[in-house]
């Protein structure tokens, strides 16, 4: 019985570790193609409302948005929050994100 309880407790506390995290680059495709964060997907700001549900179907997943300097990603954060996404972070500009970059 103790082992089952310990296993259940371990699983409960490990759930956030497995929560999905999505990085969204809200810049225009040309900028994304020049350089972007590794693993990020490109959804330009003006297309966020139309395309986000396909990229991030679970509104409880963590969504981190970035752009060039943080202004457009701030707008994207507001849009996503209004759409019901619960864990949205404005990660700022490309130079601010702590992830490897992909060029070209």
Where are these regions (language model features)?
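Positively charged n-region of N-terminal signal peptides that target proteins for export
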Residues: 1-4
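Nucleotide/phosphate-binding catalytic cleft detector across ATP-hydrolyzing
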Residues: 7
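Short, surface-exposed ligand- or partner-binding patches at beta-edge/loop junctions that are enriched
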Residues: 66
